[in-house]
């Protein structure tokens, strides 16, 4: 089994300056059309090659917002047994029922075989968490979701630059 670094944050003076500049400005949101948040959204959208990007205050807020787009009330959402507590909180905030499943010990990410075992009539959505810069087996997870008509929402808060099959 390989060793996985969970905490290796590199922050230099450039990041500290950008954070300080943003904190001292009056533009903490992108709605104004100016400022570092808008610049971040544009750069991040390009970096992950997506059509849109909305910066929020935390990973919890991002999950809460994303899950609010689906009617998960009284429905099960499959998530990994190892994640920050906010993953389950976001499900509960939206009325869903967290269904914890085991992980692949080599990646600390959801194990597709365990997902398959956990799917039942109440399952509505699968929420894989890409952890420590490692990607879940998205090919298998996407197939499971498609075959079972389940929604897929990915949590990449701990792996924003991670690639799966060459794609971020």
Task: List each language-model region with its residue ranges.
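Pocket-edge positions in alpha/beta enzyme catalytic cores
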Residues: 8-11, 28-32, 100, 107, ...
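Active-site region of PLP-dependent enzymes
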Residues: 27, 32, 158-166
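Phosphate-binding glycine-rich loop
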Residues: 30-76, 90-94, 100-102, 167
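Short alpha-helical
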Residues: 14, 35, 39, 61, ...
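N-terminal "arm"/small-domain region of PLP-dependent enzymes with the aminotransferase-like
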Residues: 1-29
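PLP-dependent aminotransferase-like
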Residues: 68-156, 163
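Active-site His/Glu-centered metal-binding helix of metallohydrolases
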Residues: 44, 156-157
